[in-house]
Amino acid sequence: MVATPSATTGLQVAQDYVIADINQAEFGRKELDIAETEMPGLMALREKYGTEKPLKGARIAGSLHMTIQTACLIETLVELGAEVRWASCNIFSTQDHAAAAMAARDIPVFAVKGETLEEYWEYTHRILEWGDGGSPNMILDDGGDATGLVMLGSKAEQDITVLDNPGNEEETFLFASIKKKLAQDPTFYSRTKAQIQGVTEETTTGVARLYKMQKSGELPFPAINVNDSVTKSKFDNLYGCRESLVDSIKRATDVMVAGKQALVMGYGDVGKGSAQSLRGLGATVCIAEVDPICALQAAMEGYRVVRLEDVVEDMDIFVTATGNYQVIRNEHLLKMKDEAIVCNIGHFDNEIDVASLKDYEWENIKPQVDHITLPSGNRIILLAEGRLVNLGCATGHPSFVMSNSFTNQVLAQIELFTKGNEYGKEVYVLPKHLDEMVARLHLDRIGAKLTELSKDQADYINVPVEGPFKPDHYRY
């Protein structure tokens, strides 16, 4: 496919992809070749299902960070028979060479690092539009934006007033993009929704949206909660963040973490990994939590459990990892010390009240790193404009841990596409034996050797010799 520069943006635009620079495709392919050696789960699925092609006929609309690791996921889906259209789920998370590598294979991808919010929603629409006028029949989501777009658009077809009062800048662009689409095609969203056989969701915040729809009876198709597979949440969320958080802070600021005081807000799996990473480089780490169980866990690990308002003037580094909104508000930002570093590793950009800083003086240091001068004269360093710091200021999680997550995604897509009529309009998790299979596929790469139960031992603890080894309620 031939790409030509847009006269208005300079981006590479073709009939069926929008990327920054097709000339980066060779670089992307070289990095993808390395990533494949670190993604044994995906490679095993290609070998197992490549001939069978269980996803033949699947049209997957993918909304997930367009990274090198995601490129490996995309190529696995294609190898298994799927047609794929892809956009990033964050305006800063795209790796342009990864997007170029996909475009060079004629895989429709719409993702540019640093795209505007207007472009973001335009690109998310593009993954729902098949060239033959058809629709996707599967969604692979991260954060729920693709699913949410279909659902909100369907509501707007019936009542356009749902788009009247945007609550923030992002909703302003989202609502405008839906109105624009409805003017072109008044039944686009309901037709698309009717074709969807299922959705697989990658992350905590997107899963919360699905459960909310299920509770209200609005979920129109089955969904698989990939996030709560043990081999996703206990690995990607924990060990991935343990490596990628400090990587992003160091790349963005070059500061010495040792000796700094850091506050991690939220002590779920992401917060646990984040706290470990900062402590590992010598920071004194405190935790802010609302959940008494998580707070007790943090205390038992030796962290001080504090309230933000009690320590805000003392901290050097602030990390939000809650999945909630307005966690760090303007009154907190105004009290921060000079050169405090503020960042977010939760999925959405509303954990930090960045909008309240817009009236202050901003100095851009480099992409996704801004100095903001407060009324007190102190300057804070805001990373990635409050969006995902590990993908905005670095390259996200390492390939190996993402292989765990993405192997779950492929299995979930196969499950819903081939057996969708066996599922109701509810949110499901993958069965335990598949979770254990994902783990098993990754052991050899790191030299781990499993001990095997004898028949007598298996009978004694009442499990099959080959597993599953734990009941569904086991917490790991």
UniProtKB/Swiss-Prot annotation:
It holds the Pfam family AdoHcyase_NAD. NAD(+) binds at residues 203-205, 237, 266-271, 289, 324, 345-347, 390. Its main location: cytoplasm. It comes from Synechococcus sp. (strain WH7803). This is Adenosylhomocysteinase. Substrate binds at T67, D142, E202, K232, D236. Belongs to the adenosylhomocysteinase family. SUPFAM superfamilies: Formate/glycerate dehydrogenase catalytic domain-like, NAD(P)-binding Rossmann-fold domains. It is found in: Cytoplasm. GO terms for molecular function: adenosylhomocysteinase activity. It catalyses: S-adenosyl-L-homocysteine + H2O = L-homocysteine + adenosine.
